[in-house]
Amino acid sequence: MTTEMLVCDIETDGLLEQMTTIHCAVVKNYLTGKVTEYRPDEIEQFIRSLEGQVVIGHNWIGFDSAAIYQWCDMNDELFIGEFYPEPKMVIDTLVMSRLLNPDRERPQELPQRVGPHSLKAWGYRLGIYKGEYGEQDGAWDCFNEDMLAYCAQDVEVTTEVYKALCKEINDG
């Protein structure tokens, strides 16, 4: 199996404490640019696609990874006699942002409640916006194509955040 660098995001029906499902996921091969979208009936396939790969995600360690393990626990019949699929390595752009510049300033046009290391803040910084999906009541209750498009946009923003952070490292 060839190791690939995959920029990933998922959308769920709630935060970890309330989550009951992963609605969708989007994966972008960092080197080729190929994007793969996963709908609700393809989540197992998505999780298996991460096996042995380098995964890049924003808040992957704090949320996405934990949500995937929680989903696997809720669907353990799919993994009888095997370990849950695991990436070879995880690169979390939220962690990178905090480590490289703990005092990073929040873009002025954002409300105080938006953290300076958030994907939304990075989107403003880079001129690649996350989108507005999810601000309406019930937005995360059921899967829909707008949610998938929002997830895909998050992957695009995360890709550019990773590039910007690598540039910060290289520029010293």
Regions found by a protein language model. Name each.
Residues T2-T3, E51-V54:
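A general structural motif
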Residues L6-V7, R48, T158:
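RNA/tRNA-interacting regions in translation and RNA-turnover enzymes
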Residues I43-S49:
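Short amphipathic alpha-helix with an adjacent loop that forms part of the alpha/beta core around
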Residues L16, V27, G33-P40, V54-D171:
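Active-site-proximal helix-loop-helix substrate-binding element of RNase H-like nuclease domains
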Residues M1-C24:
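Entry/capping segment at the start of metal-dependent catalytic domains
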